C-alpha cells in the first residue's frame, strides 16, 4: 500500500514530480495507492492544488477528502451544508462522492464528515463509496482537545481495514 497526502506535492515542484514518480512505480507494481487531499492554503493555491491532484488522480485508487477539500480542490460541494456553522447534509455527501468518482474514476471515495456542535465538541463520521454502495459510519461525538491528526487517524483506520481484508462494512 502506498499512501500520501496533498501536503507532500505542495512542498515544491520537485516534490510533486517525486510523488508522481512514486505513484507510477507503485502502480506498475500493483500496489494500491491512496491519497488524503488535506488541502493547506498556506502551501499552495486552490488552482495549483486542483491541477496537481488532477494530474495525480490517474494513479490514485482511493481518495480521501473532507467536506472542505471536496469543494476547494475538486469544486464539488454538498447541498444544504454549511461548514462554517457545522450544518451537515449526509445525503448531499453521497452525491459528492458519486460526482468525484464520476469525474476521476477512483475505486473508492472516502469522506470525513464533521458536524460542529461547538468549538470543542463535534460529531464525527465518515462515508465510503465504492461505485456501487455508499456506506456511512456510526456518528461519534468527540470532545476535541487538539484537532491535529483526525484525518490521519481516519485514513489509517481505512488502510488498516483494507489490508486486513475486512469488507467495506
Predicted regions span which residues?
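Ribokinase/PfkB-type carbohydrate-kinase core domain
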Residues: 1-134, 140-141, 166-167
